[in-house]
UniProtKB/Swiss-Prot annotation:
InterPro entries: Leu-rich_rpt (IPR001611), Leu-rich_rpt_typical-subtyp (IPR003591), LRR_dom_sf (IPR032675), LRR_domain-containing (IPR050216)
UniProt keyword annotation of Disulfide bond present: no
Organism: Pongo abelii (Sumatran orangutan)
Gene: LRRC40
Protein name: Leucine-rich repeat-containing protein 40
Gene Ontology cellular component annotations, sorted alphabetically: cytoplasm
PROSITE patterns in UniProt: LRR
């Protein structure tokens, strides 16, 4: 019998009434018998117009087979049945559900998609264990207020209904991770959605939305946002602060401008095709460090900026059906797997080259650089210089982008000619990543009055020399994927440093010197061997908002870390500690910090 607390109003003798009634041939007794053992019942695609009573009362009535054998020594002990936890009644012809739904309080999964439901019973509020509810592909026009009582719900699928508004109290779904409201008739999204702090995936596509609430940026764990096929004309600038966002879909809207994404460093896919975007500028691109897919098809773009070369991770670029007449030759230096150019009035690339596919187009663009051909946007300005080593330094990047780029050359040292190429130009960024460097190039000191960004990732550095420590204007330092296990005390002189990336090195502790750099806002030190952090010193770092300690050797998390209230992103997954439990980590940074504070000894 059901081991859950008896439902209010239920007959206490119900478990000893004869069962099997009102089932007919629609639900075979063998299926019910198996469900009492497994706790799962699948009645999809049975042409049901209503749910038989024997289903609602599966854990209430005596099963029919018990009438044949009432012996306590029987092999089949019906009284030891399992509570029904999963019920699938999808792909039927149900027009309503009765309040008998409350007779299944142990349900964790209820799947009733693809029916003809116009409403849900108020008794749904009693399914307090429900974690997944699928009511998609029905005819719901409104949701009952009682649905907000389902506080343990993690997945809610409401797509393909006729909803015109969101129920009040929706923000009470504090554990909700996956919400699909696509293909409805929604015109607004309430600001209270921002309280869905656990949400990872939100699908609002194919509605009638004209705007998104600015408060959406409070969804600190959101990774997937789909707003395709709406009426959006602008995107709130606050969206640019969503640091966890990885996939953003804005296709088929009315956007005229591409938003900037200064904080979306994890964004992997940006889909803004089929809008009315007229301009693509450097400001739109320079922060998209992780972008893999960029969809700009069917817009009104007239040009592609030279800064497209900044998207070094880009694999797929769709520029089809725009008004682009020429491409920057630097595009050929990207490692694209797919480039779509159809439907543009290109004058500088022959159709036969485009028809040969992506790699031939890239090869052609690279050949124009090698020929020192003029850029389409300027006259005969030199774009590259060949060094004695036969490698090339991008002069155009130096002049226009203020970047000294000698990356991905597998070089063991940086040739003097690279630094000589700077001449009197202002350089703000250095990129020597993806080489074989064992030490910091000594001539970097020549740029100490200019450089703010340095990327030395993916090298073989085992120590940091003083040449780096004199770059007093440095704000961003990328040292990931090296062999470092310590930082020199002189790093403290980097008084403007805001972001440091030490991931994939050999640190066994958070370098002490970092605690004394009070300008730091972001510390990334995942995938090392860090065994401890000092919460008292970290509390003094009032500007620190992001701390990534994933995949280290932390055996415990000090409760005092909860006092670091300025942290907006704290990542702890992949460590061997037992507390906080995974369920606490799933609540996000605010939940973790609150949990830790509650454990501080008084």
């Amino acid at each position: 019998m059901s081991r859950l607390k008896r439902i209010a109003g239920q007959d206490p003798r119900a478990g000893f009434k004869e069962g099997g009634r009102d089932c007919g041939t629609s639900v075979p007794q063998g299926l019910l018998k198996a469900a009492r053992k497994s706790g799962q019942l699948n009645l999809s695609g049975r042409n049901l117009s209503e749910v038989p009573q024997c289903v609602w009362r599966i854990n209430v009535d005596i099963p029919e087979e018990a009438n044949q054998n009432l012996s306590f020594g029987a092999t089949e002990r019906w009284w030891e049945q399992t509570d029904l936890t999963k019920l699938i009644i999808s792909n039927n012809k149900l027009q309503s559900l009765t309040d008998d739904l409350r007779l299944l309080p142990a349900l964790t999964v209820l799947d009733i998609h693809d029916n003809q439901l116009t409403s849900l019973p108020s008794a749904i509020r009693e399914l307090q264990n429900l974690q997944k509810l699928n009511v998609s592909h029905n005819k719901l026009k409104i949701l009952p207020e009682e649905i907000t009582n389902l506080r343990n719900l993690k997945c809610l699928y409401l797509q393909h209904n006729e909803l015109t508004c969101i129920s009040e109290g929706f923000e009470q779904f504090s554990n909700l991770e996956d919400l699909d409201l696509s293909n409805n008739r929604l015109t607004t999204v309430p600001a209270s959605f921002s309280s869905l702090s656990s949400l990872v995936r939100l699908n609002l596509s194919s509605n009638e939305l004209k705007s998104l609430p600015a408060e959406i940026n409070r969804m600190k764990r959101l990774k997937h946002l789909d707003c395709n096929s709406n009426l959006l004309e602008t995107i709130p600038p606050e969206l640019a602060g969503m640091e966890s966002l990885e996939l953003l879909y804005l296709r088929r809207n009315k956007l005229r401008f591409l938003p900037e994404f200064p904080s979306c460093s994890l964004l992997k896919e940006l889909h803004v095709g089929e809008n009315q975007i007229e301009m693509l500028e450097a400001e739109h691109l320079k922060h998209l460090n992780s972008i893999l897919v960029l969809d700009l098809r069917d817009n009104k773009l007239k040009s592609v900026p030279d800064e497209i070369i900044l998207l070094q991770s880009l694999e797929r670029l769709d520029l089809s059906n725009n008004d682009i007449s020429s491409l920057p030759y630097s595009l050929g230096n990207l490692h694209l797997k797919f480039l779509a150019l159809e439907g543009n009035p290109l004058r500088t690339i022959r159709r036969e080259i485009i028809n040969k596919g992506t790699q031939e187009v890239l090869k052609y663009l690279r050949s124009k650089i090698k020929d020192d051909g003029p850029s389409q946007s300027e006259s005969a300005t030199e774009t590259a210089m060949t060094l004695p080593s036969e490698s090339r330094v991008n002069i155009r990047a130096i002049i226009t982008l203020k970047i000294l780029d000698y990356s991905d050359k597998q070089a063991t040292l940086i040739p003097d000619e690279v630094f000589d190429a700077v001449k009197s130009n202002i350089i703000t960024s250095i990129n020597f990543s993806k080489n074989q460097l064992c030490e910091i190039p000594k001539r970097m000191v020549e740029l100490k009055e200019m450089v703010s960004d340095v990327n030395l990732s993916f090298n073989k550095l085992s120590f940091i020399s003083l040449e780096l420590c004199v770059l007093q204007k440095l704000t961003f330092l990328d040292l990931r994927n090296n062999f470092l296990n310590s930082l020199p005390e002189e790093v403290e002189s980097l008084v403007r440093l805001q972001t440091i990336n030490l991931s994939f090195n050999r640190f066994k502790m958070l370098p002490e010197v970092l605690y004394r750099i009070f300008t730091l806002e972001t510390i990334l030190i995942s995938n090392n061997q860090v065994g401890s952090v000092d919460p008292q010193k970290m509390k003094m770092m009032e500007n620190l908002t992001t701390l990534d300690l994933q995949n280290n050797d932390l055996l415990q998390i000090p409760p005092e870390l909860g006092n670091c209230v300025n942290l907006r992103t704290l990542l702890l997954d992949g460590n061997p500690f037992r507390v906080p439990r995974a369920a606490i980590l799933m609540k996000g940074t605010a939940g973790i910090l609150e949990y830790l504070r509650d454990r501080i000894p008084t």
